[in-house]
Amino acid sequence: TKKKMVYAFQGDASSDRGLIMSAKPNFRALIAPVVLLSVALPCAAEADQTTSRWETALADTKPIFNARLRYEGVEQEGLPEDASALTYRFRAGFETGKIFDTALLVEFDHIDDLIDDFNSTINGKTGYPVVADPNATELNRFQLTNTSLPDTIITLGRQRIGLDDARFVGNVGWRQNEQTFDGARVQNSSLGELKVDFTYIAQINRIFGDDSAVGRWDGDSYLLNLSHPTPIGTLTGFAYQIDVDNAGGVFSSQTVGARLAGKQAIGTGKLGYTVSYATQSDYGSSSLDYSADYYLVEGTYSVEAVTLGAGIEVLGGDDARGFQTPLATLHKFQGWADKFLTTPTTGVEDIYAKAAYQVGDVGPFSGVALTAVYHDFSADVGGADYGSELDLAASAKWDKIGITLKYADYSADDFATNTSKFWIQFDFAL
């Protein structure tokens, strides 16, 4: 059941009115119409100004429309059936122009399937591998954005939020039904180059939809993200307090950390680097008692159209709980086969190497790009071998249509089961 949301905004409607009465008593009858007119004219002008503002806001209203068609095939050892999912999504809405420095955005999603040989998480087809794209028709975003304060953006309502690289907070845009947040967000840049981003969240609208028992998470969560440029990159500090009432508070936690990401010219190319560290512990309604660490070290080197990179990412383990990132865009990390959506208690160490090649234009296709990533997984505690994964992708644009081909092959060892996935996706947006 969705929470009822009430939103309010303040406008600025002011006018200077001057009224000077200096007349002898015997002229009152003559002056009275002048007095009435002096009051009426500013009121009429103010009304005309307000009407003009509304007309401008409506004239500046922009439509929102995008569509996606995707086939996903999954072979997973241990299940009697292979999954074949052909799903589509329509997303439509509008964003008004500003009136009293405030804009309204309304957006709906409709997700359905054309081939339904898969476990959508709510259709009961448990003999198939999971493809987490259940049928749904939902209000995706409903927000008011106000910019009346200097260097400040205030967003109220159901909104999309992605912080940094979405490792801790993201919209899970890969899935057909994205993750959104009901709350209030304030972004401020009045303190020089320091950017302050604070959000209060009352409800998390997850990718599983209204019909799922885990489709909505309620609670009081707070996200604080501070960033500042330095000569060697952007330095970010963050504190995320997630308090989720659902599931016995298992996903409630507090995470505090820092991140540095930058690029430097080296020779004929560019060296990119990212380092991050965070510590996490139980918080709020959590019934657990744990503490776990996270760290990331990644380097890339780009020369013209070629980028090579490698890194190590560790989500630490604890006797009670591994380091969790329940609000992240999880598909982006630890392999596209999605075998580590929940971190085991022994944690996950991911050592990876990647290569990308920007091919450019090929025939009718533009922006052709190729990507390959190899992962080696192991436990942070105990050193168990979690297996390996090879991910391949190709993407391009044909006019206004984006085309994506992806393949993931996970080879299990002491964790999970062998799994391979294939996707072909078409995107269109106005």
Tell where the protein language model's regions lie, with residue ranges.
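Signature for the C-terminal beta-barrel architecture of outer-membrane proteins
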Residues: 150-152, 172-320, 351-353, 358, ...
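Cleavable N-terminal export/targeting peptides
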Residues: 1-55
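Conserved, mostly hydrophobic/aromatic
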Residues: 65, 156, 355
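Transmembrane beta-strand segments of Gram-negative outer membrane beta-barrel proteins
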Residues: 53-75, 100-106, 194
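Short, solvent-exposed loop/turn elements at domain surfaces
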Residues: 71-76, 318, 336, 351
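Surface-exposed loop and membrane-interface regions of Gram-negative outer-membrane beta-barrel proteins
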Residues: 72-88, 98-143, 148-149, 154, ...
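Outer-membrane beta-barrel biogenesis signature
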Residues: 43-63, 102, 344-347, 356, ...
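Flexible internal linker/loop segments at domain or repeat junctions
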Residues: 322-346
